[in-house]
Amino acid sequence: MNEVEIIDNSFLRQFETKVEGILAKIEYSSQERKVFLTKLVVPEEITKEGFKEDFIKSVLNHIQEQNLRVVPTSPQIAGFLRKNRQYKEMLPVGIRI
């Protein structure tokens, strides 16, 4: 995995990174120690192989470091979690993907 440098823009409620000046983001909302990942936006101009996966992993690692739970409401992020079961302990009790 290539670690992606992310910024938590809490004002806009999104995790951000830039690749060659192009903004990619994961929008979120938070409630009671849970982070709801609602939308992944990676412009087509970002063609770097494996970027989406590395970006999602970096965001999940950031959330994990803060001992928060994650609720993936974005289909792309839910699909990533299905394939990467090492993050399943981050899901709140009762949430299955």
Residue ranges and their predicted role:
Residues T47-N61:
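Conserved acetyl-CoA-binding loop-helix of GNAT-fold acetyltransferases
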Residues R13-L23:
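Conserved beta-hairpin
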Residues V41-T47:
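A short, internal acetyl-CoA/4′-phosphopantetheine-binding micro-motif in the GNAT/acyltransferase core
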Residues N9-F11, Q31:
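Structural motif
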Residues I22-I26, V35:
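Glycine-rich phosphate/pyrophosphate-binding loop shared by adenosine-nucleotide-utilizing enzymes
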Residues S30-T38:
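A conserved beta-turn-beta hairpin within the catalytic core of GNAT-like acetyltransferases
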Residues H62-I97:
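C-terminal structural segments of small proteins and small subunits
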